[in-house]
UniProtKB/Swiss-Prot annotation:
Primary localization class, coarse: cytoplasm
CDD domains, sorted: LbH_THP_succinylT
Family of this protein: Belongs to the transferase hexapeptide repeat family.
Name of the protein: 2,3,4,5-tetrahydropyridine-2,6-dicarboxylate N-succinyltransferase
Keywords, in A-Z order: Acyltransferase, Amino-acid biosynthesis, Cytoplasm, Diaminopimelate biosynthesis, Lysine biosynthesis, Repeat, Transferase
Organism expressing this protein natively: Aeromonas salmonicida (strain A449)
Lineage: Bacteria, Pseudomonadati, Pseudomonadota, Gammaproteobacteria, Aeromonadales
Length: 275
């Protein structure tokens, strides 16, 4: 455990007594350093280690403490003013800093301080919350939302209106994770710490939480909380045991590998679900 982590862990135990006016200098410095690490992508709330996702709960604690040490203040926008505890990530960026970051930010896209946006990423008018990690080559399309501490992989496309759930409380909950080379269709929602594994394609209007049944029509398996790698997923339903009604489910209609994805467009994969 690093010294920074030790300070954060100790401060979190007494978090109810921490205010902007009472926080000691060492604790405040540790919190601000941690937020800077998240902001720069030098630390991330979750990372894949030896093939398994590991969540660093102390970083989530630092984010929660960051709210405790900040007063609300005016945040200026182009046409409006805002009142919040967390500053905006790009509010003081110069043209040179944007070039160095390699990020394109289309107005009125918003990213909060403490989120990381990797090079070669495009933010259309969208929202990226504190603690989130958006990796290289990703498109966050119009009105998409990347929730607090969510992890978005390389070369991901979050289509218009997509919602990727955030998670700060309860503290033990895992962040929502979209792995590399995934496509999330318009107006879909992935929440509650669900993991969409590498190379998956989620069709338009699919809603997946921890209780959502994810049915593989080829094998008959039902998954919860995880979309297996290379899945093509559409909205569907499964019959009840009594046969009197059906309930919503996400349906894996096929599996694809990287070679197939390279040769066949996303639309072709989704249009051929009955083959």
């Amino acid at each position: 455990m690093t010294e920074l982590q030790q300070i954060i862990e100790a401060a979190f135990e007494r978090r109810d007594s921490i205010t902007p006016g009472s926080v000691d200098a060492a604790t405040k410095s540790a919190i601000l350093q941690t937020i800077d690490l998240l902001d720069a992508g030098k630390a991330r709330v979750a990372e894949k280690i030896a093939g398994e996702w590991v969540v660093h709960q102390w970083l989530k604690k630092a984010v929660l403490l960051y709210f405790r040490i900040n007063d609300n203040g005016i945040i200026k926008g182009d046409d409006a003013q805002y009142y919040d505890k967390v500053p905006l990530k790009f509010s003081d960026y110069t043209a040179e800093q944007f070039k160095e970051a390699g990020v394109r930010v289309v107005p009125p896209a918003t990213a909060r301080k403490g989120s990381f946006i990797a090079p070669n990423t495009v933010l259309m008018p969208s929202y990226v919350n504190i603690g989130a990690f958006v990796d290289e080559g990703t498109m966050v399309d119009t009105w998409a939302t990347v929730g607090s501490c969510a992890q978005i992989g390389k070369n991901v496309h979050l289509s218009g209106g997509v919602g990727i759930g955030g998670v700060l409380e309860p503290l033990q909950a895992n962040p929502t994770i979209i792995e590399d080379n995934c496509f999330i269709g318009a107006r879909s929602e992935v929440v509650e710490g669900v993991i969409v594994e590498e190379g998956s394609v989620i069709s338009m209007g699919v809603f997946i939480g921890q209780s959502t049944r994810i049915y593989d029509r080829e094998t008959g398996e039902i998954h919860y909380g995880r979309v297996p790698a290379g899945s093509v997923v559409v909205s569907g339903s499964l019959p009840s045991k009594c046969g009197k009604y059906s309930l919503y489910a996400a349906v894996i209609v096929k599996k694809v590998d990287a070679k197939t994805r390279a040769k066949v467009g996303i639309n072709a994969l989704l249009r051929s679900i009955d083959e």
